[in-house]
Amino acid sequence: MKHVKNFENKKVLVLGLARSGEAAARLLAKLGAIVTVNDGKPFDENPSAQALLEEGIKVICGSHPLELLDEAFAYMVKNPGIPYTNPMVVRALEKNIPVITEVELAYLISEAPIIGITGSNGKTTTTTMIADVLNHAGQSARLSGNIGFPASEVAQPVTEKDILVMELSSFQLMGTESFHPHMAVITNLMPTHIDYHGSFENYIEAKWNIQKNMTKEDFLVLNFNQDLAKDLANQTQAKIIPFSTKEKVDGAYLDGQMLCFKGQAIMSASELGVPGSHNVENALATIAVAKLSGVSNEAIRETLIHFGGVKHRLQSLGNIAGVKFYNDSKSTNILATQKALSGFDNSKVILIAGGLDRGNEFDELVPDIKGLKKMIILGESAPRLKHAAVQAGVTYLNAKDVAQATRIAFQEASPGDVVLLSPANASWDMYKNFEVRGDEFITTFKSLKGE
């Protein structure tokens, strides 16, 4: 790694732990910083803080005392999930203390070039696709960032022979100053995380940070299905490589059923290992990055044919007696479930849906569920989903949890059918998170397969 001098003998406050904060604290100590960690969780319930203290790093836990900022900190490294309205962050900015995220640290020390991927939907799938394609082609791609591997940790051992493929959230990008990927992708831009950013305009501004240090030597891959992306394309120094499923563009595009790049047919959309129109978009973004990285058409096709998806994101589990199972537990809203259903023939789909009741009516889901073979409904939102099923003319059955729903769905299925867990709701009424919900689906699938 690059041994940058930016933090040497400087006081740095790491605000918020979790994996990224813990990794940042260790890295800063390696770089010679005088590190203080502040986390809201009490010390005796905080194994990360305990481990850092044993390593000689100062930790203050249980609250966020504003007087802590009376010290002359040169930087604050903020956990991405902590909003800028947090009193500690507000006070730091008032004192002109630079507030950064650990992604900025990763960039400063990385010897490897960076491919950054952001967007409202499809980030994780596209990031994983890109890394898989590059690795299949014999390159050395390392996943990092919002995908679960702290960027500042992954960046330490890499060399110029590696490539950091980094998933980036708007929260992370807000805390960047010099961050400069040589290639970047914005999958799409939808009005999300408005509670954090305050407005859609602020959210776009945070996402747009991905390109702010890019030059004409760099490449920015944008989704030209969106007029917003076309407008933004005029506001960057980077070379634009568009992708689209609606028109032929000077980049990656869908021509009939063929996925193409600048006139070359790469593969048929029907060959993709994951279904859904959104995954065609993800694949096109991947193709653009792969071709810019010198990957052969054959290597791209081989990878995308066998790509089984990312865990809990329209993940293909396999089949039992000709019935296919897909785990899309990450679909915590209506739009995500609509996209999941777009990849299937409704007459063969048994949909498992329901979860936390946020007061949503499901009227906009009605056109998408028409013609479903059946629905298995569970959770707090069950009454509202049942109403939507009746409107759509779909037969539904009740289940107490995902395990029971999966068994009922399999009993109702015939060879050639699809059992799809795509809840259209958050999980917190019954499960700690969508991962636990999805894991229950996977466990039940494995149990059924073994019976």
From Swiss-Prot:
Domain of life: Bacteria
Official protein name in the record: UDP-N-acetylmuramoylalanine--D-glutamate ligase
Catalytic activity, EC: 6.3.2.9
Main location: cytoplasm
Species for this entry: Streptococcus mutans serotype c (strain ATCC 700610 / UA159)
Cellular location(s): Cytoplasm
Pfam family, one: Mur_ligase_M
Example GO BP: cell division
Gene Ontology MF term list: ATP binding; UDP-N-acetylmuramoylalanine-D-glutamate ligase activity
Any one GO CC term of the record: cytoplasm
PANTHER family named among the record's database cross-references: UDP-N-ACETYLMURAMOYLALANINE--D-GLUTAMATE LIGASE (PTHR43692:SF1)
Family per similarity comment: Belongs to the MurCDEF family.
Pathway terms, separated by semicolons: Cell wall biogenesis; peptidoglycan biosynthesis
